[in-house]
Amino acid sequence: VDNEAIYDICRRNLGIERPGYTNLNRLIAHVVSSITASLRFDGSLNVDLNEFQTNLVPYPRIHFPLVTYAPVISAAKAVHEANSVSEITNACFEPNNQMVKCDPRNGKYMATCLLYRGDVVTKDVNAAVAAVRTKRTIQFVDWCPTGFKLGVCYQPPQHVPHGDLAKVDRAVCMLSNTTSIAEAWPRLDHKFDLMYSKRAFVHWYVGEGMEE
């Protein structure tokens, strides 16, 4: 999860002019809730946490899943949005909805896990995934052609009173392992160098016995 990406989602999708940590945490809470929903509620295709590792991590060192959540819309916009299974599935493959700033169109997917909640039937999910497969912009590595793990939980997304997100009948959280996440590392490396050059926060580590 990349704070910069989540700030942008809050501004663009939710119309929050100056998002704070409360806004970011509320959005992240929806993601965590969706990932663990199948452990807590019934569904036709339940997925446990061990399956994430099995399906998303082809090699131990390639273990950096990219998170996407849809729909992220405010109550004002929800009136005009249909949010069908197909629409929220397609939204997960849009760079603007990802919680790390990178462009999957520049890389290839190794594995994808789609976790649906609410008013969702397996037939619609299969149709949405089949449509995604036909898109040329979404490419999978040659050695992992199937690439999709699906989860369906019947419990609808929980609406938080006075929260930022609108109440919706269905939602999807996507965890994917894509080579494009490599774009995030040089940016993170640069930010670290800037902070370390000013010795920001270094005193906390020195206080715990580490050398500067």
Swiss-Prot record:
A GO molecular function held by the record: hydrolase activity
Subcellular location: Cytoplasm, Cytoskeleton
Keywords: Cytoplasm, Cytoskeleton, GTP-binding, Hydrolase, Microtubule, Nucleotide-binding
Reactions this protein catalyses: GTP + H2O = GDP + phosphate + H(+)
GO biological process, one term: microtubule-based process
EC number of this enzyme: 3.6.5.-
Function: Tubulin is the major constituent of microtubules, a cylinder consisting of laterally associated linear protofilaments composed of alpha- and beta-tubulin heterodimers. Microtubules grow by the addition of GTP-tubulin dimers to the microtubule end, where a stabilizing cap forms. Below the cap, tubulin dimers are in GDP-bound state, owing to GTPase activity of alpha-tubulin.
Protein name, per record: Tubulin alpha chain
Gene: TUB-A
